[in-house]
Amino acid sequence: VGITVKSGRSVFTYARIPIGTATQELQALAEREYEEVGQKDLDRLNVDWARYGELDAAGKLATFIAKRDGMIVGYAAFIVQTHIHYQDALVAANSAVYAVPEVRAGRVVLKLLRFAEMGLKAQGVQKIYYHVKQTKDFGRLLGHLGYEDVERMYAKVVRDREVG
C-alpha cells in the first residue's frame, strides 16, 4: 500500500515494503550512501540483509521507500520495538535514511519521512528517533516536521586496524 504523487514530469510513489522484496535495489543505494557518509573507520560496507529479514519477519522492522518512475530513489528503515526503559512504549529507531542526490532538491525526503511517520503511527509507534550524521545534517528538516534535538551520539573505534 502506498501513495502516488505527480511532480513535474516524474511520478513518485511512497510505500512500505517487506525489505526482502527489494534488497538488490536497496543494496545499490546503500553503497551510494556509504560513499557519501559511511563510517570508513570500520570495515567495508556489508549490510546484514538476513538480519534485516529476520527483524522484518518478527514485525520489528519498518521499511519505507520512495520511487521515481518505478525506481527506488530513497528509503527510510526503522527498528520497531518496545523501549527498554519504558516497556509499555513502542518506539521506532531510524536504522537508515537516504535519498539519491538527484531528488534532494525537491520534497521527496520530506514526503518520505511524513509517509514513514504516518505508517509508524498506524502501527502503534509512540515515539520515533532519528540519528543524524554531522556530515549530512538534516536536522532542520526534522525540526520542520516537529522533531526535537534531544541528545548527541559519540563514537570511538576501539579495536586496532589489521595491517595487511
Question: What label would you give each PLM region?
Answer:
Residues 143-164:
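C-terminal "cap" of GNAT-fold acetyltransferases
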Residues 95-106:
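A short, internal acetyl-CoA/4′-phosphopantetheine-binding micro-motif in the GNAT/acyltransferase core
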Residues 128-139:
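Conserved beta-strand-loop-alpha-helix junction that forms the acyl-donor binding cleft
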Residues 104-118:
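Conserved acetyl-CoA-binding loop-helix of GNAT-fold acetyltransferases
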Residues 40-63, 67-68, 76-87:
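A conserved beta-strand-loop-helix scaffold within acyl/acetyltransferase catalytic domains
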